[in-house]
């Protein structure tokens, strides 16, 4: 069964135009996207859809792959108080630097300061138990550390993921 409110957007510009006109009135939309590392301008990539959604205070959620093999990504307004991944925070920082964030996207941002992310004590203790592991972890770029640890912490708090 095809989801409701499927957009015909074929790229980020078309999605952005739709969001500009509808982000305050619509409850959701679905876009056909491809996951993976972008390799072609002729494909609407998942990351492009997510970045555009974030610019308007929206977020990705459910995906559906239909019998024809097309994957649809659901986009919807972000709920107040919802969890933010470090990856999406970084996407917002990037979109802001590029001048693409809207006032609506900025209005829903969480604490974006370095103090806004703290490694859980039990995870930190586990990393520090082994000197080699801790040394390797510290050699990773700071963003990589935050994104990887955040993924673990989110899954720890939401086991259904």
How should these model regions be labeled?
Residues 1-161:
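Charge-dense, helix-prone N-terminal extensions
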């Amino acid at each position: 069964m095809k989801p409701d409110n499927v957009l015909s957007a074929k790229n980020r510009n078309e999605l952005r135009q739709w969001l500009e006109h509808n982000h305050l009135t619509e409850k959701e939309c679905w876009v056909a996207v491809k996951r993976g590392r972008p390799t072609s301008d002729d494909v609407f990539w998942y990351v492009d859809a997510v970045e555009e959604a974030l610019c308007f205070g929206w977020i990705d959620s459910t995906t559906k792959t239909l019998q024809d093999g097309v994957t649809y990504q659901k986009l919807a307004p972000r709920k107040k108080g919802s969890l933010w991944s470090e990856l999406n925070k970084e996407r917002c920082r990037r979109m802001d630097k590029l001048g693409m964030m809207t006032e609506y996207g900025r209005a829903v941002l969480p604490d974006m300061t370095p103090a806004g992310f703290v490694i859980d004590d039990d995870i930190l203790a586990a990393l520090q138990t082994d000197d080699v592991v801790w040394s390797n972890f510290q050699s990773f770029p700071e963003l990589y550390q935050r994104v990887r640890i955040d993924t673990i912490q989110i899954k720890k708090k939401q086991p259904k993921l």
